[in-house]
């Protein structure tokens, strides 16, 4: 395992290093470096949702956010959509998987999209995630705005998010079950516009 206790899935060591050394930012990649997460100067983890917010706002300010749209997946945090609404930025939601993100981008002429996990696609340069490119783009924004990474995320509040995996015999049948549908509807009504519930089949 080339990323044993390291990389984007074990970012604790990077958080500690950034704070101890007084660094401006840190970047963590997965094994093939198509995913990138960041650590700000305070040691906070900057997820793919943060990155989409930062660069989406940056592109909008410069009139380069084609179709005024950032492409996300259904797994993005509810707070990201609230922040986009406040900034007047449109968004699209695709199924989970960077291939679905890129398919939407290609069909609709969008320039930026990605996943919470750190797969970020800049379609002007690539058709898939590129961790090194994502790092460069984040530093570009920091330099252009003369701002710390933590300042770039101030307009984004990440809502509490809980992921639960439930084993079932038949994934499709479980989602179509009347009791499951009723339970989901009840939660949606209780949350209103303050949160959301997502029930989906796992791809594995």
Language model segments and positions:
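Catalytic-core signal marking the mid-to-C-terminal active-site face
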Residues: 144-204
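Phosphate-binding chemistry for phosphorylated carbohydrates and sugar-nucleotides
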Residues: 1-145, 158
């Amino acid at each position: 395992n080339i990323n044993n206790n390291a990389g984007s899935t074990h970012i604790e060591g990077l958080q500690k290093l950034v704070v101890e050394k007084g660094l401006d930012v840190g970047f963590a990649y997965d094994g093939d470096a198509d995913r990138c997460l960041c650590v700000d100067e305070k040691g906070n983890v900057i997820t793919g949702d943060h990155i989409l917010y930062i660069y989406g706002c940056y592109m909008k300010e410069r009139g380069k956010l084609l179709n005024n749209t950032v492409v996300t997946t259904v797994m993005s945090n509810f707070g990201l959509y609230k922040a986009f609404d406040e900034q007047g930025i449109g968004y699209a939601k695709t199924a989970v998987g960077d291939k679905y993100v890129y398919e939407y981008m290609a069909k609709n002429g969008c320039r930026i999209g990605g996943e919470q996990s750190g797969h970020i696609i800049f379609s002007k340069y690539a058709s898939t995630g590129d961790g090194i490119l994502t790092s460069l783009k984040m530093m570009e924004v920091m330099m252009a705005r003369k701002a710390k990474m933590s300042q770039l995320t101030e307009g984004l509040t990440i809502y509490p998010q809980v992921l639960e995996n439930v084993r079932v015999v038949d994934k499709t049948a479980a989602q179509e079950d009347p009791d499951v549908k009723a339970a989901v509807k009840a939660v949606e009504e209780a949350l209103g516009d303050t949160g959301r519930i997502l029930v989906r089949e796992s791809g594995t």
